């Protein structure tokens, strides 16, 4: 039987990734995004991936796996988006990865339902990543 309860004591990445190395890379990405207020340029992301491939964070993770598996999963589910952003230092528009605020209903849907699960996951993501 499927459980319709979300255990918030587990890390958010355990919900999306089953492999330990993917979870570690995803946790490192979320930590990096939090430290940069939810936005990273392509260059900052490339520097971050270099630290993963070199093993500076205590584990190694390949560039291809990171972009395809970890970042691809976050982008597929709509948690992270690649958006045009103004760069005042260069006086031009560049692409940056940004945390996406998930839409959450004011009134919780009845459970068990898919809408209930989607609402709870969105609320969990917003509590974890979105800082106003």
Regions found by a protein language model. Give the residues of each.
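A short, conserved structural fragment
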Residues: 72-86
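Alpha-helix boundary/N-cap detector
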Residues: 20, 24, 40, 65, ...
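Short, amphipathic alpha-helical interaction segments positioned at domain boundaries
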Residues: 98-132
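Short, hydrophobic-biased segments on the C-terminal half of alpha helices
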Residues: 63-72
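Short acidic, hydrophobic short linear motifs in intrinsically disordered regions
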Residues: 38-58
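Short alpha-helical segments that sit at the start of domains
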Residues: 2-39
